[in-house]
Amino acid sequence: MPQKPIWSNAKTHQKILKKLYLFGFSGTPIYAENTQGFETTESVFGECLHRYTTIHAIRDNNVLPFCVSYHSTIKQKQDFDTSKDKQVKAIDTDEALLSLQRIDYITNYILEHFDTQTMRNAKAYTLNGKRLRGFNAIFATQSIPMVMQYYKEFQAKLDKIPESQRLKIGIIYSYAPNDKLESLESTQGLEENAEINALEQSQRDLLDSAISDYNAMFNSNFDSSAEGFQNYYKDFSLRLKNRELDLAIVVNMFFTGFDATTLNTLFVDKPLRYHGLLQAYSRTNRILNAARSFGNIICFRDLEEQTDKALALFSDENAKSVVFLKSLEDYLNGYIDDKGKKHKGYLELLKELQAKFPLTNFLESTLTETQKRTS
């Protein structure tokens, strides 16, 4: 059952209060395409009065554009027997997504590219009286079992690195005191009620272990009791905002209502769509300083189609050129924009320069000048 939105009583209020005027403000309104069982925003509040979209915010320098890259880590439909029923195919897919080879590949990728993606070699800046270089990241995963797999793999690899060079990695997911595991599809309410989901014993044990590692990193004393977990969540959130944590591995937390100007990168290994996708991406595009010119999104799932759909729904079908920076491949090889205009890439421009101003002529003239001076 989808959760009741906070504005679900609006129609009741309108019936009782005949002269009531309601103004609804929403960053990601509910349309027919993304209702998921809810009423649309228009059916509750009426016709939209004004739209201020991501395009406007970027052009007004209120937020940054995104740079999105897609990394194929699993073959899609052709890998799975279409004759199987949905439940069996889902099991096959889960096994492939949680395979040790895939987890190892993605973990290695993040560790090898972390400093580059989070700009650790950029010019230092001051935050809360501290001098910092670069930014930090969130790693969004599909499920608690996936968080567990990744955390174990990261810890195993970090143990082989000198302590001074290790990333500070933390995980957080919510549970209830009983053993009834519930759906983690919705991101609503997790921050307000961190005990909404129950955990199996193995999941609870790993969370305890991760909190213990966190305590060792920051000389704290949190635990997974009801009060202890709430305090852990608050401290975790604060350290993420202050860039004391390098990487937070999560399932659904910190995707809505969490703003950290030091957070520039989102690694994604989960399905996202419509408002959930834009809310997750938008954790990375807050303005801090000149070193940050875009929000950095690295997808280990094929989210390109869902990304385009979300942008078209909440902004404009032609917004892509404003909201998303071109890929490195486009800048290297050239591209054709939405209006059909061709833009030459770096490689083609370099060839043109070499043809017009060959280095052989430069070397010959330099040699001649040198000979004149020595003769």
Language-model segments: which ranges?
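Hydrophobic alpha-helical scaffolding
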Residues: 3, 43-44, 57, 93-103, ...
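Conserved coupling segment at the C-terminus of the helicase ATP-binding
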Residues: 28, 72, 141, 366-372
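Short, conserved secondary-structure transition motifs
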Residues: 30, 142-145, 171-182, 299-309, ...
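Conserved C-terminal RecA-like helicase domain
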Residues: 95-250
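Long, hydrophobic alpha-helical segments
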Residues: 288-375
